[in-house]
């Protein structure tokens, strides 16, 4: 998997770069990911994934990372595994999932968020079975930090723009 997917996921060449998506949320499993119902069943060297994801960030990306429950896994978050799901299969055909609807959300024009149905989509296990929650929490924790840093930078910019505007303001010719 690393040889096949990582070079394009990490490329600095925008013509070669594959965009990535994260599919976690389901209609009945928003903030409680332990309720995830999307199922993955082993099929040779890959897995077939079925179910619906609800708020899929960057839904039209070339590569998806998603959490699913494998057959026979324990209930709750300890039974979740992470899978890589390519948009296109090795034979050039599209994988077996479809974007049902794009969400009309404020502030996400550059990254479509949508509802996706997986109908036997081919996926590849990343890491070990039942470690998906640990893997995704590392990513989520890092993204929370970056959101905080961006918010602080935006506040500083707003303060600087306001100061500059106040210093250079003319009122009644003065």
Question: How would you name each of these model-derived features?
Answer:
Residues 28-31, 55-57, 74, 105-111:
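Short Gly/Pro-enriched turn/cap motifs at secondary-structure boundaries
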Residues 15-17, 30-33, 41-48, 109-134:
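Active-site-adjacent "gating/activation" loops or surface patches in catalytic cores
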Residues 1, 33, 43-46, 117, ...:
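Alpha-helical interface subdomain recognition
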Residues 46, 50-94:
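A short core secondary-structure module
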Residues 22, 40, 49-51, 83, ...:
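Buried hydrophobic positions in well-ordered alpha/beta secondary-structure cores of metabolic enzymes
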Residues 1-38, 42:
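Internal maturation/activation junctions in enzymes
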Residues 18-25, 48, 95-101:
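Short Pro/Gly-enriched beta-strand edge/turn motifs at strand-loop
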Residues 91-100, 112-143, 160-174:
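A glycine-rich, basic-preceded beta-loop-alpha segment at the flavin cofactor/substrate interface
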